[in-house]
Amino acid sequence: MVFLDPTEISFPDPEFFDSENGLLAVGGDLSPDRLQFAYETGLFPWFNPGEEILWWCPDPRFVLFLEDLKISKSMKKVLRDEVFTFSENTCFRTVMEECRNAYRKDQDGTWISSELIDSFVELHKRGSAKSIEVWQNDELVGGFYGMQIGKVFCGESMFAKVSNASKAALIYFVKNHPELEMIDCQIHSEHLESMGATMISKKNYLTILKKQA
C-alpha cells in the first residue's frame, strides 16, 4: 500500500503493484484533477466516512461489455410499455445526491461526500463525468453517474426509487451509446451479473483502459 502526498498528483502503477484485496493507495485528496487521473490510471476512491481516502484497483474487475447486455422478458415489457422516460446530464448533482441517500443492503452511500460531489460536478462541467436520469410522471426515480474515459464508462453509483428504474437506466445507456466498448462496474453485484456483467482480470482491464489514452 502506498501513502499519497496530498501536494502531488500521482498513483502507483496498478499494472506493477498488486495487493490481496485491491487496495493500492491511501490519502491524497478528492480534487477534480486527482480524480480524473485516478480513473485514467484504473483506480477509484471508496472509503467510509471519517476515514482516509482509499484508492482501489481490484483483481479481478467486474465489467459489462456492451454486446453482452442481457434484457429479461419482464424488462423488455417495461421498456415496451414506456413506463419511464430518460435524459442525460440534466441534473448531475441531484443524481449524485440521490445515490448518496439511497439505501443499500450491504453498504451505504455516505462515502459520497459533499467534497466528492463538488469535484464530480466540476468534472461534469469539463465533460468527463456524466449522468443518466430516469423519470416517471415528471419525478426523478432512478439513475446513475460515472466517468467516461474514451470508450470506457466507469460507473460509480446508481439509485432507484421504484422497481426496475436502475435496470432501465443501464439498458437505455447501453442502447444509446454504441460507441462505448465497456462499462466498468468495479465490484461484483448480483444485480449487474444478471444483466451480463462479468469478471475480467486486472491485466485485461488495464489493457483496454490504456487503449483509451
Go through each PLM region and give its residues.
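N-acyltransferase acceptor-side catalytic subdomain
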Residues: 1-213
